[in-house]
C-alpha cells in the first residue's frame, strides 16, 4: 500500500496473494520487493500498477533473511531462499548473471538459507555473506568473484574505507576489501556474570566503532587502533 503523508489516506493498494518478505528498494519511481516464493516484483510508485515480475526457485523451508535486495545504477541484485543471487538489468529487463551459494558447513548443515543484506561500494563491488559458510566480494557488472573467504555471518557487513567490518556471535573481524585478507580478528567476553555475548549490530562514527550486543552491552573499538577497546 501507499499512504499520503499529508492526510494519511491510502493512495493505492495492491494484493498479490503471497506475502512480501524482503526489504524494499525504490529506483526511478518503481518499487522492488520479493515475496516468500522467491518472486520479485516491480511496482509503479505512483499508481500501484504491476510493471513486471520475475520468478526464481524456492524451497518449502525459508526465512525472511533469505530475501535481500540492492540496486546499483540500473542493476538489481537480490538473493532468494534457494541460496542464489541474481543480477537483473533493469533497462533490458533480463538476467545479467546469477550465482549459486554452495553450502560449505558440513558439520552442522543449515537447512534454511540466510543472507546478510547486500552491500555495494561506490566502485560497484558487492559484499555478501550467509550461513552457508562464506563471505564474497563480487563485481556487479559481470558477476565475477573477486574473492571468497570461509567466514560466515547473517549480520550486516559494513564498508569503511578499504575495510569490511563483520560481526559473528561474539567476534569482530576486519577484512581487506580489495584482497579478502583478514586484518583483525578478536572475540570478546561479556562483562556481566552468567551472560553470553552475541553481537547484533555495528554503529560507526568519528568517536569509534560500536559493537552492540544482545544483552544491552556495547563495546567501543578505536577507528585507528582496533586493539584499543572500551
Annotated model-derived regions:
Residues 4-8, 44-48, 89-93, 139-143, ...:
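Short loop/turn segments that connect beta-strands within beta-propeller blades
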Residues 128, 136, 149-159, 165-177, ...:
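Flexible, glycine-rich surface segments
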Residues 142, 207-208, 213-230:
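C-terminal closing repeat unit and adjoining cap/tail of repeat-based domains
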Residues 28, 35-36, 73, 80-81, ...:
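Structural signature of WD-repeat beta-propellers
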